[in-house]
Amino acid sequence: MHAYVYKSQRKQDTFVYLATRDDFSVIPADVQARLAPFAFVLDVALTPERRLAQADADTVRAALASHGFYLQLPKTVVLAGECDYD
Protein backbone atom coordinates (compact mmCIF):
# COMPACT_ATOMS: atom_id res chain seq x y z
CA MET A 1 0.00 0.00 0.00
CA HIS A 2 1.17 3.49 -0.83
CA ALA A 3 0.61 6.59 1.29
CA TYR A 4 1.02 10.25 0.46
CA VAL A 5 2.16 12.37 3.38
CA TYR A 6 1.29 16.04 3.87
CA LYS A 7 2.15 18.40 6.70
CA SER A 8 -0.26 20.93 8.10
CA GLN A 9 0.89 24.47 7.52
CA ARG A 10 -1.21 25.62 10.48
CA LYS A 11 -0.31 23.12 13.20
CA GLN A 12 3.32 22.21 13.76
CA ASP A 13 4.31 18.52 13.70
CA THR A 14 0.89 17.46 12.38
CA PHE A 15 0.76 15.23 9.32
CA VAL A 16 -1.96 13.66 7.17
CA TYR A 17 -1.41 10.41 5.30
CA LEU A 18 -3.68 9.93 2.28
CA ALA A 19 -4.44 6.75 0.34
CA THR A 20 -4.89 8.78 -2.86
CA ARG A 21 -2.62 11.68 -3.71
CA ASP A 22 -4.23 15.10 -3.21
CA ASP A 23 -7.63 13.57 -2.26
CA PHE A 24 -8.41 15.87 0.66
CA SER A 25 -12.14 15.16 0.27
CA VAL A 26 -11.75 12.16 2.62
CA ILE A 27 -10.72 14.44 5.50
CA PRO A 28 -13.69 15.71 7.56
CA ALA A 29 -14.47 19.40 6.99
CA ASP A 30 -13.88 20.36 10.63
CA VAL A 31 -10.41 18.77 10.55
CA GLN A 32 -9.58 20.51 7.28
CA ALA A 33 -10.73 23.84 8.72
CA ARG A 34 -8.24 23.51 11.59
CA LEU A 35 -5.27 22.11 9.68
CA ALA A 36 -5.38 23.20 6.01
CA PRO A 37 -3.53 24.18 3.96
CA PHE A 38 -1.36 21.11 3.57
CA ALA A 39 2.07 20.83 1.96
CA PHE A 40 3.14 17.60 0.25
CA VAL A 41 6.09 15.95 2.02
CA LEU A 42 6.62 12.50 0.50
CA ASP A 43 5.09 9.33 -0.81
CA VAL A 44 5.93 6.12 0.99
CA ALA A 45 5.32 2.41 0.48
CA LEU A 46 3.71 1.06 3.65
CA THR A 47 5.02 -2.49 3.62
CA PRO A 48 4.76 -4.72 6.72
CA GLU A 49 8.49 -4.15 7.30
CA ARG A 50 8.19 -0.35 7.04
CA ARG A 51 9.01 1.56 10.22
CA LEU A 52 7.66 5.06 10.65
CA ALA A 53 9.07 7.69 12.99
CA GLN A 54 5.95 8.37 15.06
CA ALA A 55 3.21 6.06 13.81
CA ASP A 56 2.68 2.34 13.60
CA ALA A 57 2.61 1.28 9.93
CA ASP A 58 -0.15 -1.31 10.57
CA THR A 59 -2.34 1.35 12.17
CA VAL A 60 -1.73 3.74 9.27
CA ARG A 61 -2.54 1.03 6.69
CA ALA A 62 -5.77 0.13 8.52
CA ALA A 63 -6.87 3.79 8.69
CA LEU A 64 -6.08 4.33 5.01
CA ALA A 65 -8.06 1.23 4.04
CA SER A 66 -11.10 2.13 6.13
CA HIS A 67 -11.14 5.96 6.03
CA GLY A 68 -8.78 6.98 3.23
CA PHE A 69 -6.62 9.03 5.59
CA TYR A 70 -4.60 8.88 8.80
CA LEU A 71 -4.00 11.89 11.04
CA GLN A 72 -0.68 12.02 12.90
CA LEU A 73 -0.75 14.52 15.75
CA PRO A 74 2.33 15.77 17.61
CA LYS A 75 3.45 13.77 20.59
CA THR A 76 2.57 15.37 23.89
CA VAL A 77 5.35 15.83 26.39
CA VAL A 78 4.48 15.70 30.06
CA LEU A 79 6.95 17.49 32.27
CA ALA A 80 7.66 16.11 35.74
CA GLY A 81 6.26 19.22 37.39
CA GLU A 82 2.94 18.76 35.55
CA CYS A 83 2.32 15.21 36.81
CA ASP A 84 -0.10 14.39 39.60
CA TYR A 85 1.59 11.75 41.73
CA ASP A 86 -1.19 11.42 44.33
Curated annotation (Swiss-Prot):
Domain of life: Bacteria
Disulphide bridges: none
HAMAP family according to UniProt: UPF0745 (MF_01866)
InterPro entries: YcgL-like_sf, YcgL_dom
Organism annotation: Xanthomonas campestris pv. campestris (strain B100)
Sequence ranges assigned to domain YcgL in this UniProt record: 1-83
Name under which the protein is recorded: YcgL domain-containing protein xcc-b100_4189
Pfam families linked: YcgL (PF05166)
